[in-house]
């Protein structure tokens, strides 16, 4: 009888474990994407202190890379290692967490290669489009898109809307915003993993500058 009782409880316990794992995944995604969203302040800072901001981003990229190599060798770096552990996904376990590197590199390259308005569009697309798409997919994504490694309709539509709005508020041109948002949504669908942090600001910055 006791054995039967345990068997009856097992599905509930399993559901509880799955729920906790999902909540943990959502919490990590919220933390990760809050960093993405904070990058929306970069275009404003670039207007007033361009060189110091670019220097700070480059220094952050280098210091983070050093900290990650040390972490992989078993040496913990105060604050940096804690932030990495809080943001790391399952696929990042025991690996160099590349996301912050590509995030900084994408922003730096966009700022260096494009006019300020185009760089801003690319950076905002990264901050809001990519940032909110993943959250929407985790929270509301029930319909999966085939051949996209788990991307969802909710995430893609959120990406499109966020890029369209942020682009329009920079250029006040609906056609450009529509084109940029469409390209951004397509990039978001590709299985680029952390490399989307590079492709989104660079490709969308180029599209915006070409069309404006």
Regions of interest found by a model, annotated:
Residues 2-146, 151-212:
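Hydrophobic alpha-helical transmembrane segments
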């Amino acid at each position: 009888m006791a054995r039967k009782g345990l068997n009856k409880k097992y599905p509930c316990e399993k559901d509880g474990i799955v729920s906790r794992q999902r909540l943990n995944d959502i919490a990590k995604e919220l933390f990760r994407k809050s960093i993405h969203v904070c990058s929306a302040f970069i275009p404003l800072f670039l207007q007033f202190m361009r060189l110091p901001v670019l220097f700070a981003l480059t220094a952050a990229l280098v210091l983070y890379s050093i900290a990650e190599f040390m972490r992989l060798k078993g040496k913990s770096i105060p604050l940096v290692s804690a932030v990495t552990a809080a943001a790391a996904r399952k696929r990042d376990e025991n690996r160099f967490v590349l996301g912050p590197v590509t995030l900084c590199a994408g922003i730096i390259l966009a700022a260096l290669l494009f006019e300020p308005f185009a760089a801003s569009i690319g950076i905002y697309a990264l901050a809001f489009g990519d940032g909110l798409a993943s959250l929407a997919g985790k929270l509301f994504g029930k319909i999966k898109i085939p051949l996209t490694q788990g991307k969802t309709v909710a995430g893609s539509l959120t990406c499109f809307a966020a890029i369209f709005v942020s682009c329009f508020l920079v250029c006040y041109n609906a056609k450009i915003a529509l084109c940029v948002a469409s390209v951004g949504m397509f990039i978001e669908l590709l299985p680029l993993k952390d490399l989307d942090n590079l492709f989104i600001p660079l490709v969308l910055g180029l599209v915006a500058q070409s069309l404006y």
